[in-house]
């Protein structure tokens, strides 16, 4: 009954905050799913839907006990956590995937400033195959992941030194027993959450490059790279071709969606190599809306 009351309240108020979430599984009542769908259709974007059959195995794969995983909750907007026993450090960083791709295509040059920013591994005109481009993209991601992890380590150290949280520590399991503040590893679970941003843009860009440059060879690498460097100022027809003639992520085109999934999985596997200063692991999240405007402001033209 409470679930339906929450849905009714959201339908009446249509507030953007606090975020309302709905956990579902294969035996969720059809009536509940339909009620949630009607409320989502009112335009507030809520309730957010969380699939237990995807979330619970993902949590246990990261060392969360089955009991705690089944009792998961959502912190902040969409980040997953457990009840009363974790410091997940959600939003420790946001990683601009499409910026890493831009630097891969441009030889490490920031298209907005013209200054060196990333690793010079070649550029679009020097990668003879799509596989070479992918290898360079992976290497660019690796470089910035290392830089990001180093920065996060400093931030976490300074939080522990300058901003301990004794009240929070008093209500998080294991902190009292360990005699440690939650910022120093007192919690039962100590995670660091990093959000990957602009997966759809990466999939769309790589799909366009793969199809037009490497497979069909209807667009030369030189022409496309020039268009990216000049923001398509003298290439409106090429921009139209990229927008309308190449399949896009999220439209049930398997090979395009697989590009997005591939780089999500790669980024997640890359994060698994790191450990935070509290003895815990890194885990990945995905943001699909909130960070796209500020992230997009820091990216040049994309394919």
Residue ranges and their predicted role:
Residues 1-303:
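Conserved catalytic cores of very large enzyme subunits
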